[in-house]
Amino acid sequence: MIVITAPTGQIGSRLLDILLNEAPTHGEELRVIVRDPGKLPAAVRARVDVVTGSHGDAAVVDRAFTGADAVFWLVPSNLQAPSLDSVYSGFTRAAAGAFKTHGVGHVVGVSALGRGTPAAARAGQVTASLAMDDLIASTGVAYRALANPTFMDNLLRQVAPIRDQGVFTDTVTADRTAPVAATRDIAAAAAGLLLDRSWSGAGEVPVLGPEDLSANDMARILTEVLGRPVRYERQSLGDFRAALTGYGIGNAIVDGYVDMMRAKDDGLDGGVRRTPRTASPTTFRAWCEEVLKPAVLA
């Protein structure tokens, strides 16, 4: 039995699609934890065991982890949380206890790059995510943290300015190169680990994409794919903070985002060497052709 948390989210929904296709050939049953089962297609609900509720709730994870062999763990965003610890480790503590109570053998979690880099000491959400990984590993469960860089898919939030003004923004230096990954590759990495549980102990699995890119590189590729000029504009951390605050996001979360983006510009994502094992397949150009361009043209 594989339990999937956040099955309607960007990564979890892709993972669920993969497992629905592949799990039967591995003799695996699937269970999902979801707040609103109505967000799952009826055809999906018919093929999985559904536990309704929040996976931060002790009673919910107690039901969901009964008889479970493996768990996919992803914490949801909480833009009004009083602290980053409450978003990550605080949300995970009930599940960590349930892993031990129910003898869950393997857990795969969504985390971040940065462990071992100087920038990770004050990197907001990344620092909190790494602490969550340590909490899960301390239970003795076999654990793999998917160590991810910035998602290509984050650009979908900027479809309107890309389409209407030919511009996208970020806070990083324009020519600083770093890995970027597609969420579909993160889901595929999770599926591989959940279906082949021959691994043990605790560790990280970096998902780095096939190449490092700068914001200027991304602007060039966007221009070529969309057939129209697209440029990058660097946003100051002060303006970034003001924009997040204007959206009504809580102070603790805003502080974390600002610290994380500062750390990324200080090399947070550059501490892992790309190898055939860590290089995920989707190029930024392919992602733009297959995902971003249709969204821009819609």
Sequence positions of predicted segments:
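Oxidoreductase cofactor-interface core, primarily capturing Rossmann-like NAD(P)-dependent enzymes
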Residues: 1-40, 56-59, 66, 77-86, ...
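General small-molecule cofactor/ligand-binding pocket signal
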Residues: 49-51, 144, 231-235
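Aromatic "clamp/platform" in nucleotide-sugar-dependent glycosyltransferases that forms part
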Residues: 87-92
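Conserved Rossmann-fold cofactor-binding substructure of NAD(P)-dependent oxidoreductases
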Residues: 45-69
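A hydrophobic C-terminal alpha-helical subdomain
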Residues: 200, 237-298
